[in-house]
Amino acid sequence: MPKRKGFLYEWMCDKEHIREAIVFGAKDKHDRRDVRRVLADVDGFTDRVYDLLQTQTFAPAQPKKRKIFDNSSRKWREIEYVPFFPDGIVHTLMVLAAAPVFLRGMNYWCCASVPGRGGKHALRRCKRVIHHDKKGSRYVCKMDVHHFYHSVDRRKLIWMLAHKIKDKKY
Protein backbone atom coordinates (compact mmCIF):
# COMPACT_ATOMS: atom_id res chain seq x y z
CA MET A 1 0.00 0.00 0.00
CA PRO A 2 1.37 3.46 -0.84
CA LYS A 3 2.43 5.86 1.89
CA ARG A 4 -0.19 8.42 0.82
CA LYS A 5 -3.76 7.74 -0.24
CA GLY A 6 -5.91 9.73 -2.62
CA PHE A 7 -9.42 9.68 -4.12
CA LEU A 8 -11.04 9.26 -0.71
CA TYR A 9 -13.78 11.78 -1.53
CA GLU A 10 -14.79 9.76 -4.58
CA TRP A 11 -14.88 6.66 -2.36
CA MET A 12 -17.17 8.53 0.04
CA CYS A 13 -19.56 9.47 -2.79
CA ASP A 14 -20.51 5.82 -3.41
CA LYS A 15 -24.08 5.09 -2.22
CA GLU A 16 -23.13 1.64 -0.89
CA HIS A 17 -20.43 3.18 1.29
CA ILE A 18 -22.90 5.81 2.53
CA ARG A 19 -25.41 3.07 3.43
CA GLU A 20 -22.62 1.15 5.22
CA ALA A 21 -21.68 4.31 7.15
CA ILE A 22 -25.29 4.84 8.25
CA VAL A 23 -25.59 1.29 9.59
CA PHE A 24 -22.12 1.33 11.19
CA GLY A 25 -22.60 4.80 12.71
CA ALA A 26 -26.00 3.88 14.17
CA LYS A 27 -24.57 0.92 16.10
CA ASP A 28 -25.25 1.34 19.85
CA LYS A 29 -27.23 4.56 19.19
CA HIS A 30 -30.69 3.12 18.51
CA ASP A 31 -32.11 4.90 21.57
CA ARG A 32 -31.51 8.33 19.98
CA ARG A 33 -34.51 9.81 18.17
CA ASP A 34 -32.46 11.30 15.31
CA VAL A 35 -30.81 7.92 14.65
CA ARG A 36 -34.16 6.09 14.61
CA ARG A 37 -35.48 8.66 12.12
CA VAL A 38 -32.56 7.95 9.75
CA LEU A 39 -32.84 4.17 10.15
CA ALA A 40 -36.55 4.33 9.28
CA ASP A 41 -35.65 5.66 5.80
CA VAL A 42 -32.09 4.54 5.05
CA ASP A 43 -32.49 4.85 1.27
CA GLY A 44 -33.86 8.39 1.47
CA PHE A 45 -31.11 9.58 3.79
CA THR A 46 -28.50 7.80 1.65
CA ASP A 47 -29.67 9.87 -1.31
CA ARG A 48 -29.65 13.09 0.75
CA VAL A 49 -26.07 12.52 1.96
CA TYR A 50 -25.05 11.59 -1.60
CA ASP A 51 -26.49 14.89 -2.87
CA LEU A 52 -24.69 16.86 -0.13
CA LEU A 53 -21.38 15.25 -1.06
CA GLN A 54 -21.85 15.53 -4.83
CA THR A 55 -22.72 19.22 -4.67
CA GLN A 56 -20.10 19.80 -1.95
CA THR A 57 -22.64 21.70 0.17
CA PHE A 58 -22.07 19.85 3.45
CA ALA A 59 -21.42 22.33 6.26
CA PRO A 60 -20.56 20.84 9.66
CA ALA A 61 -22.75 21.82 12.61
CA GLN A 62 -21.43 23.15 15.90
CA PRO A 63 -21.10 20.29 18.40
CA LYS A 64 -23.35 20.26 21.46
CA LYS A 65 -21.96 19.53 24.93
CA ARG A 66 -23.33 17.10 27.47
CA LYS A 67 -22.13 15.61 30.75
CA ILE A 68 -22.25 11.85 31.17
CA PHE A 69 -21.14 9.53 33.95
CA ASP A 70 -18.51 7.05 32.77
CA ASN A 71 -19.00 3.83 34.75
CA SER A 72 -15.65 2.33 33.75
CA SER A 73 -13.58 5.19 35.19
CA ARG A 74 -16.22 6.24 37.76
CA LYS A 75 -16.16 9.93 36.84
CA TRP A 76 -18.16 12.56 35.01
CA ARG A 77 -17.09 13.36 31.46
CA GLU A 78 -18.04 16.29 29.28
CA ILE A 79 -18.57 15.07 25.73
CA GLU A 80 -19.29 16.90 22.51
CA TYR A 81 -21.61 15.37 19.96
CA VAL A 82 -23.10 16.32 16.60
CA PRO A 83 -26.46 15.45 15.02
CA PHE A 84 -26.49 12.04 13.38
CA PHE A 85 -27.72 13.47 10.08
CA PRO A 86 -25.71 14.66 8.24
CA ASP A 87 -22.67 15.21 10.50
CA GLY A 88 -22.49 11.81 12.17
CA ILE A 89 -22.90 10.00 8.87
CA VAL A 90 -20.23 12.10 7.13
CA HIS A 91 -17.84 11.66 10.08
CA THR A 92 -18.33 7.88 9.92
CA LEU A 93 -17.79 7.96 6.15
CA MET A 94 -14.53 9.85 6.61
CA VAL A 95 -13.29 7.38 9.22
CA LEU A 96 -14.20 4.37 7.07
CA ALA A 97 -12.46 5.93 4.06
CA ALA A 98 -9.26 6.79 5.95
CA ALA A 99 -9.06 3.69 8.18
CA PRO A 100 -6.65 1.76 5.91
CA VAL A 101 -4.32 4.78 5.84
CA PHE A 102 -4.26 5.09 9.63
CA LEU A 103 -4.09 1.37 10.41
CA ARG A 104 -1.12 0.90 8.07
CA GLY A 105 1.30 2.87 10.25
CA MET A 106 -0.26 2.07 13.60
CA ASN A 107 1.52 0.06 16.26
CA TYR A 108 0.01 -3.40 16.78
CA TRP A 109 -0.59 -2.63 20.46
CA CYS A 110 -2.65 0.53 19.85
CA CYS A 111 -5.94 -0.80 21.14
CA ALA A 112 -8.30 2.15 21.61
CA SER A 113 -11.04 2.64 19.00
CA VAL A 114 -9.61 -0.01 16.67
CA PRO A 115 -12.04 -2.75 15.57
CA GLY A 116 -10.84 -6.18 16.66
CA ARG A 117 -8.63 -4.72 19.36
CA GLY A 118 -9.60 -3.25 22.68
CA GLY A 119 -9.73 -4.18 26.31
CA LYS A 120 -9.25 -7.92 25.80
CA HIS A 121 -6.39 -7.34 23.38
CA ALA A 122 -4.60 -5.02 25.84
CA LEU A 123 -5.32 -7.28 28.82
CA ARG A 124 -3.82 -10.27 27.01
CA ARG A 125 -0.64 -8.26 26.34
CA CYS A 126 -0.40 -7.09 29.97
CA LYS A 127 -0.81 -10.63 31.29
CA ARG A 128 1.86 -11.91 28.91
CA VAL A 129 4.31 -9.17 29.96
CA ILE A 130 3.71 -9.83 33.66
CA HIS A 131 4.00 -13.61 33.25
CA HIS A 132 7.27 -13.44 31.29
CA ASP A 133 8.81 -10.63 33.35
CA LYS A 134 12.48 -11.51 33.84
CA LYS A 135 13.29 -8.55 36.09
CA GLY A 136 10.58 -9.35 38.63
CA SER A 137 8.96 -5.92 38.53
CA ARG A 138 6.67 -5.12 41.42
CA TYR A 139 5.09 -1.81 40.47
CA VAL A 140 2.82 -0.60 37.69
CA CYS A 141 2.15 3.00 36.71
CA LYS A 142 -1.31 3.71 35.32
CA MET A 143 -1.51 7.16 33.72
CA ASP A 144 -4.09 9.30 31.95
CA VAL A 145 -3.65 12.58 30.09
CA HIS A 146 -6.17 15.13 31.39
CA HIS A 147 -8.26 16.66 28.55
CA PHE A 148 -5.93 15.34 25.85
CA TYR A 149 -8.06 16.25 22.84
CA HIS A 150 -8.35 19.87 23.97
CA SER A 151 -4.55 20.15 23.93
CA VAL A 152 -4.13 18.99 20.30
CA ASP A 153 -3.00 21.77 17.96
CA ARG A 154 -5.54 21.53 15.13
CA ARG A 155 -3.37 23.22 12.50
CA LYS A 156 -0.56 20.78 13.20
CA LEU A 157 -3.00 17.86 13.10
CA ILE A 158 -4.35 18.93 9.69
CA TRP A 159 -0.78 19.35 8.44
CA MET A 160 0.07 15.81 9.59
CA LEU A 161 -3.07 14.40 7.98
CA ALA A 162 -2.16 16.10 4.70
CA HIS A 163 1.01 14.02 4.64
CA LYS A 164 -1.05 10.82 4.78
CA ILE A 165 -4.00 11.86 2.60
CA LYS A 166 -3.48 13.53 -0.78
CA ASP A 167 -7.10 14.38 -1.51
CA LYS A 168 -7.89 18.12 -1.44
CA LYS A 169 -11.66 17.51 -1.40
CA TYR A 170 -11.40 15.18 1.58
Predicted regions and their residues:
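Carboxylate/His-rich catalytic cores and anion/metal-binding grooves
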Residues: 161
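Hydrophobic (often cysteine-bearing) scaffold residues that line and stabilize catalytic clefts
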Residues: 86-90, 122, 153-157, 166, ...
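Short, conserved non-catalytic motifs in the polymerase core
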Residues: 29-37, 64-91, 105-117
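Amphipathic alpha-helical blocks
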Residues: 38-62
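Generic hydrophobic/packing signal
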Residues: 53, 72, 86, 97-102, ...
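Active-site-proximal segment of RNA-dependent polymerases
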Residues: 1-9, 15, 95-153
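Short, compositionally biased low-complexity segments
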Residues: 12-28, 61-69, 95-101, 131
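Non-catalytic, polymerase-adjacent accessory regions of viral genome-replication enzymes
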Residues: 1-47
